[in-house]
Amino acid sequence: MKSRFLFVVLGYDCSKVAKDCDTKNERYFCLTTACVLRKIVLVVYFCWVGLDMSMFLKRAAIGAMALMLSSTTFAVGNERIDSFSDAKKKLENQVYTEAVNRVTIYCAAKYDQRKNVTRPKGFKLPLNRDGEPIHEKRAKRIEWEHIVPAENFGRAFIEWREGHPLCVEKGKSFKGRKCAEKVNRTFQYMQADMYNLYPAIGAVNALRSNYNFQLLDADTPSTFGSCEMKIVDKKVEPPVRARGVIARTYKYMDGAYPAYKMSRAQKQLMDTWDAQHPVDQWECTRAKRIEKIQGNENPIVKAQYQKAGLW
């Protein structure tokens, strides 16, 4: 009976309690409260079985320290750069400064300082009904892709959904991204967050749109020839090379901004991709540079490198 009770208490995952709390502050409170309650139950247990309380208290102190240093990480978002245009310029001039790192996220296409793309061998654009390549002009240059699409977090803002008294042009009111960008400071910060921006071939960025990432059937063909980016029925499966970066970006945005929240299925997929595809040196260097410019860290990336002693 006693051993079974101990097994249940020790097997309880405190972090699960925090998953349904809405904001990062609420998640921290939920997590801390749940784990403190677990420790109280353990005190009762040790009294019940008559173990040395002084030894238990020492172990409890160690456990509390481990909790503080646990892998449950809460990010703080961008509060310095409020212009999407400025964010793109800073990425181009202060982050992607070496030619070796000027490579697009999905198709590994190289590009120059003027954003001109060298398409990978075998890269193809899908064709329209007239047999012409779609977004041919945009395929020649890179664009800064929101990994978590602006629309997916923008819909949380009333200015996006309904407009605002200040969102009027030539006597006509407007809403959507243009309105949120004009009047909502939080949206401005989220849209300009450099951790969420990666270079992509313009045509790929256009066709990805605001569709969510997921796994498609194994026999689904690539949409772009040799670039293993698959887009079908408003669903997107990214190439293997991009999955770790995508996962850590989604997890960062989910932790940093209460306005954005992943679904349970998304969280499970991103946790899987994060574990399967660890960070590399460039992802670490990129995060360091952005932290210096933007003023906030990306703890999702940073925690992995600190664990490996590489930060």
Predicted region positions:
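Aromatic-lined ligand-binding clefts that engage carbohydrates, nucleic acids, or primary amines
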Residues: 76-141, 270-272, 282-283
